[in-house]
A protein has these predicted regions:
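C-terminal regions of mature proteins
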Residues: 214-264
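Substrate-recognition/cap regions that form aromatic- and gly/pro-loop-enriched pockets
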Residues: 139, 144-232
Length: 264
């Protein structure tokens, strides 16, 4: 049911080179707890309140093919990501019009021709694309960086997540990286686990996500202003950050507003 009962906002970001990818991927991975905490908007399951502000995040954290691998918080390059993908078990493989269970075999086994159920055939590009689509981590490498850690929300905030990360990744990258270099990997991973329940109160490096959200919101605004993308009303992209501004100003997530309405 989790694919039918959860909805997220996915964001795709470009990179220019492997070095550019390494920096952007590390930043986005490190900010995953903020993505969950700030954009928490799924406290309900089947018309009943759960114990979480982002129940969607909790559900996907619990899958064997999801989560935030520790290696994502290191200087992950293309080769290391390829190794990560190769050693992940196959969810399934296609045999003509049939779908065959992976049975613990990895994509590396597939490449070596060691899957007898498909007559030891080796993979094609399409097989790799299918395998990549069945890795449910909080972010993924494709021809772009795919962010998957935000809850979906209504129209007024739908562009907030993309705008938030656009401002950081494209125009305030080095300043953002300078901040997270002081964060310990285990602190980020702990915050990642706690964020679905604690939201803005989750702590990284002894400060709340609410605090860090304001720090990165300021950098995101700066980045969007420097991009200078103007609409026909002569307004720049910072207009899309209004929802995030309100959440951080009130120190209250959309999930908490839902909970208040349901309890009253």
């Amino acid at each position: 049911n989790m694919m039918y009962q959860t909805a997220g906002t996915q964001i795709n970001l470009d990179y220019l080179s492997e070095n550019d990818f390494v920096k952007k991927f590390k930043l986005v991975a490190s900010l995953t707890p903020l993505s969950i905490g700030i954009f928490a908007n799924s406290p309900v399951k089947e018309k009943k309140l759960t114990r979480y502000l982002s129940y969607r995040s909790k559900v996907w954290q619990s899958t064997s093919r999801g989560g935030l691998p520790k290696i994502f918080l290191e200087n992950l390059d293309f080769e290391k990501y390829a190794d990560f993908i190769l050693t992940k078990p196959l969810l399934f493989v296609n045999k003509g019009n049939k779908v065959i269970a992976g049975k613990g075999k990895t994509f590396q086994d597939f490449m070596m021709g060691n899957i007898k159920e498909i007559k030891n055939r080796k993979p094609k590009k399409k097989d790799l694309e299918v395998h990549l689509s069945t890795i449910f981590t909080e972010l993924r490498l494709k021809k772009y960086i795919e962010i998957r850690s935000l809850d979906a929300c209504e129209w007024d905030c739908h562009c907030a997540g993309p705008a938030f990360f656009t401002g950081l990744v494209y125009s305030s990258l080095e300043e953002s990286l300078d901040i997270i270099k002081k964060w310990k990997t285990n602190d980020i991973l702990n915050a990642y686990i706690e964020a679905p329940k604690k939201g803005l109160k989750t702590e990284i490096n002894n400060k709340s996500i609410g605090y860090w959200g304001k720090v990165f919101l300021k950098l995101s605004k700066k980045g969007l202003i420097s991009r200078n993308k103007i609409n026909n009303k002569k307004m720049n992209e910072t207009i899309f950050l209004k929802s995030v501004e309100n959440i951080l100003k009130e120190n209250k997530t959309k999930a908490e507003l839902i909970i208040e309405r349901m309890k009253n």
